[in-house]
Amino acid sequence: MKPSWLQCRKVTSAGGLGGPLPGSSPARGAGAALRALVVPGPRGGLGGRGCRALSSGSGSEYKTHFAASVTDPERFWGKAAEQISWYKPWTKTLENKHSPSTRWFVEGMLNICYNAVDRHIENGKGDKIAIIYDSPVTNTKATFTYKEVLEQVSKLAGVLVKHGIKKGDTVVIYMPMIPQAMYTMLACARIGAIHSLIFGGFASKELSSRIDHVKPKVVVTASFGIEPGRRVEYVPLVEEALKIGQHKPDKILIYNRPNMEAVPLAPGRDLDWDEEMAKAQSHDCVPVLSEHPLYILYTSGTTGLPKGVIRPTGGYAVMLHWSMSSIYGLQPGEVWWAASDLGWVVGHSYICYGPLLHGNTTVLYEGKPVGTPDAGAYFRVLAEHGVAALFTAPTAIRAIRQQDPGAALGKQYSLTRFKTLFVAGERCDVETLEWSKNVFRVPVLDHWWQTETGSPITASCVGLGNSKTPPPGQAGKSVPGYNVMILDDNMQKLKARCLGNIVVKLPLPPGAFSGLWKNQEAFKHLYFEKFPGYYDTMDAGYMDEEGYLYVMSRVDDVINVAGHRISAGAIEESILSHGTVADCAVVGKEDPLKGHVPLALCVLRKDINATEEQVLEEIVKHVRQNIGPVAAFRNAVFVKQLPKTRSGKIPRSALSAIVNGKPYKITSTIEDPSIFGHVEEMLKQA
């Protein structure tokens, strides 16, 4: 069965249309589709694979590419898109009819699973390793070729279709760091379903709010997650989430982890993964439009409504493929390791989709930097699997350093293939940066991006010849496509080394979010209204004379805990819901290991007879149940009153400064300035 709209035409070298492409239509599954085509173009053009150059670091290629991306983005990204296989060529590279949203590769059709898996097999690379699964918490190591991944993914796609999932439907994934989580992501992408993968560390309340918001037809989960020293039962967490919430999915697909007891299934609702896969029919890729949502990923925010970032398929595929070579400097076939979690944007972009799109081997690590079993774990993984480049958070490096300051446990390993260490997720302090360089003996490069962008905003683009020894404290230069500027509150451009608002001049490049799920008003209001014509990153920082960006702080109330963005407002809401606390403000307290940890300033209710110690114990437990251990909430200071503005707002920046022993300014809007002195005194006594 070949839908008429799949009668693709081949773009000729002159850019015109050639004859119809015959394509192929394998008789597998209900949704057989034409094999995607590569829209041909000159190799080595701007943004293409041929532009990769691991040069001396003069940055001349970077300058050329960045200038081209700003002055002629259509041509630049059109060339980059030639490295992706398309069922139907796009009619327009860029469209800005509905600003601030930019549509990329308009009317083009593709499938990201085809690009990440099938096409490598068709190009004779089916026996190459796609995934290395390394799980010290279960003492398991396994490798999976592209052929093996395709077999699992295509069958799982068949399972989903059998149970009513079709293009445009939503699927929630709540799984640990196991290959089956990646298979589920790719299977959803294969049939055009929209996945929403939720970090396994979130408690039932957080899971419930996301399920209610995304309304999945199916939830895919596993029997257990494994943490050092304990086992997390996922199914009871899902059950509790469904009790709390309103939405009830049609089916729950449960993967029972090997060598552990099987969890009981609810008749009529629950499906056993192994049983379903044993009788599954493989399903082919379903073409989707470039703008079709690939996934919804929830990010912390200051508003009560969940912020579900929508990722458009086409631009994302183009940007990720381009970034693996141009930013990270990798050749197809090399081993790449992003030491993150699939539940975060790094996991989506650079554990799953990015490396597979580029034909790399990706490491899926179910473990920690320390404690699984010790601070030598990262060195072992790098050595055993021949990793060429690692991406991790500074917190992980700090944890290793804290337990093994001289890196004695790492010295037994030979890191001959290791060439670059990239860090992101939080600001990397200079001390951690220098220690990493000395220990790993490779360039250590900080870079900066956000859930909303899906890939780096600033970086040292080593594939384009950027320096591998940038000044300490910076987070790289503007990535091609991201025209980063520093503005004051009056939208005036600031000079070098002047602290201001970090913004990006529109249009945003391919791969950036296209909206917020069921909340387009917030999309426009939060990101584009304060600085018309720009994307507001809501971060503050400055640029130096060479164009390096220094990200200094977050301008909203999101606390970065060990690279995880946690909303202070969500913690406050949880504390207040306990009933013992009348008022509270949560701010980030600087922490040598985690970067920041939340500290609550609490005002007790007058009718509470319990001691402050008892209340603290209770609210810590309450937050853990509501948000999960990922919040890392353990400390509170009890005060008589909180400072407020006349409109009732808490001056977070001033409180954050007090908590961290820094100077602060009392603005004229504060109702009772004397309360600041009381807060300072209570912090000293704590």
Swiss-Prot record:
Substrates-to-products reaction catalysed: acetate + ATP + CoA = acetyl-CoA + AMP + diphosphate; propanoate + ATP + CoA = propanoyl-CoA + AMP + diphosphate; butanoate + ATP + CoA = butanoyl-CoA + AMP + diphosphate
Transit peptide: 1-29
GO molecular function: acetate-CoA ligase activity; ATP binding; medium-chain fatty acid-CoA ligase activity; propionate-CoA ligase activity
EC numbers for this chain: 6.2.1.1, 6.2.1.17
Cellular component GO terms, alphabetical: intracellular membrane-bounded organelle; mitochondrial matrix; mitochondrion
One Pfam family, short name: AMP-binding_C
Alphabetical GO biological process terms: ketone body biosynthetic process
CDD domains the record matches: PrpE (cd05967)
Highest taxon in the source lineage: Eukaryota
Record's subcellular location: Mitochondrion matrix
Top EC group: ligase
PANTHER family: ACYL-COA SYNTHETASE, ACYL-COA SYNTHETASE SHORT-CHAIN FAMILY MEMBER 3, MITOCHONDRIAL
Homology family: Belongs to the ATP-dependent AMP-binding enzyme family.
Protein name: Acyl-CoA synthetase short-chain family member 3, mitochondrial
Natural source organism: Homo sapiens (Human)
